[in-house]
Amino acid sequence: KKIPFQEIDKTDHQISFYASTKKSTESLAHSYSSLWKLPITMLRFFTVYGPYGRPDMAYFKFTKNILKGKKIDIFNRGKMYRDYTYIDDITDGIYKLLNKAPSLNSKKKFKNDSLSSVAPFRILNIGNTKKIYLLDFINTLEKELGKKIKKNYMPMQKGDVHSTLSDSSLLKRITGYNPKTNYKIGIKKFIKWYLNYYH
């Protein structure tokens, strides 16, 4: 499997409903863009974490269970990595894109540009561009919470992927995007928010 992921990589054979819905959304958006000449930029987010995040995300559930003294399920024995991207870096990237809408007359200026040839449409990765192993992420949670984690090692989940890593160089070339938050700092900020918000 090719890592890091680029916007122009083929994504035609999804192995989960989650991935299928994301691909379907991109296809529908491209159709709208083509039919009505509507400028659209689709963003592929890479494992966003931080305050006010989705409670169903692993880092959120881990934190909740650790504080309750419950075991946390660690799939594939933790032998996987993700491109954890802090919310502040995500919002910074989105803000930089606001005046960079694709146009029908645009020409591909960059190598591996995902700009459509028939619509004002482009797909962009937005990630931290660094691989963080799951166990390193969990160990940092443990340190910041000051609690020993009870771990329940599980096999790989059906439909899950071993690793994700973004190539966000196209976004950087278009906007100057440059994620700055180290995952340890991001976790520290998240834990501070979580304890204040929920306790």
Residue ranges and their predicted role:
Residues 1-42, 53-54:
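Catalytic helix-loop patch of NAD(P)-dependent Rossmann-fold dehydrogenases
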Residues 3-5, 49, 74, 151:
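Short clusters of hydrophobic/aromatic residues that line enzyme substrate/ligand-binding pockets
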Residues 13, 21, 51, 55, ...:
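Residue-level signature of the cytosolic catalytic core of signaling kinases
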Residues 46:
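Proline-glycine-enriched beta-turn/loop adjacent to the NAD(P) cofactor-binding site
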Residues 50, 54, 83-86:
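Active-site helix-initiating loop/hinge in glycosyltransferases
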Residues 64-199:
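C-terminal substrate-binding subdomain of Rossmann-fold SDR/epimerase-dehydratase oxidoreductases
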